[in-house]
Amino acid sequence: MQLDNILSQLFENQALTKAESQYFFEQVIQGNVSNEQLAGALIALKVRGETIEEIAGAVEAAFANATAFPAPDYAFADIVGTGGDGQNTINISTASAIVAATLGYKVAKHGSRSVSSKTGASDVLSALGINVTISPQTARQALDENNLCFLFAPLYHAGFKHAVPVRQTLKTRTLFNILGPLVNPAHAKRQLLGVYSPEVLKIYAETVRTLNHQHSIVVYGSGLDEVAVHGETLVAEIEDDKIHYFSLIPEDFGVQRHSIEALRGGEPTENAEKITVLLQGKGEAAHIDAVAVNTAMLMRTFGERDLKANVQRVKDLLRTDKAYQTLQNLAQYQ
């Protein structure tokens, strides 16, 4: 296979096979593709729209070149969004992961520094005193003992660094936004995946189905890559190799509506302060409800289907400081 041929195909608006995509992204990960070539390829993919085969090929390339994580044999999940929704909200997925872990669900959260928003998952966790660069063995220990670990993407997918200058220069969503959530190094088979557009929802669901997940849910929340408390959430639930599409509104979770402005965040320190207050049992109503609906949906991947009951469990927890204890315990792993 030749890099030049693949680039020519892309520039002529032809889709790549899964094998061609895997080859191309392995070349990217190994540093064999120039910034100019990569920028051209990513834009060509974006303008045409990435196919399931192209995304799946990139996922395979990432896994084939990733640092291994000692995956457990017990059930665990991941909650992660593509980012790139441009809304700069507080880190709802990160807070939800901490809450779910406190309720007894094991979560291996995959994430990185922000590339296209103000504050990524690792930015806010660092501000909360968490060492995001612990070894895979230590992270596994945290998951075993504390129900929660954070897997810092650059540590496991070192080759992605070759794409960072291009991503930062382009300042637009690319296949890498789509890729990140799908390449959890623990190979999570249960995931709550947030996407940045309704168009990506279907292609994401189809891609997840090819990756043999046990029970994963893809959501798009009226402009957010999360379950929304300000409007409708489009849902694709992937279970037993079937995809079920439906939509939910805040009332389906038993919560009231809040404006998206009430969820706005900022720099890592600001988001960290808001999350700390929330985990200590003193959170703002909008923050509590946003975390409750997302945690409720994550619980569903473990078979807890009653969303209203799940929300109530979260709200009861967030009247205490137990979730803050989970965060403090996580900080002990260095």
Curated annotation (Swiss-Prot):
Instruction: Recall the GO molecular function terms of this protein's record.
Output: anthranilate phosphoribosyltransferase activity; magnesium ion binding
Give the E.C. number(s): 2.4.2.18
Question: Which positions are annotated as binding 5-phospho-alpha-D-ribose 1-diphosphate?
Answer: 81, 84-85, 89, 91-94, 109-117, 121
Can you tell me which residues bind Mg(2+) 1? S93, E226
**Keyword field contains Transferase:** yes
* Co-factor remark: Binds 2 magnesium ions per monomer.
UniProt catalytic activity: N-(5-phospho-beta-D-ribosyl)anthranilate + diphosphate = 5-phospho-alpha-D-ribose 1-diphosphate + anthranilate
Positions of anthranilate 2 binding: R167
State whether it acts alone or in a complex, and with which partners, per the record. Homodimer.
A Pfam match is: Glycos_trans_3N
Required cofactors, per record? Mg(2+)
Task: Write out the similarity annotation.
Answer: Belongs to the anthranilate phosphoribosyltransferase family.
Q: What is this protein called?
A: Anthranilate phosphoribosyltransferase
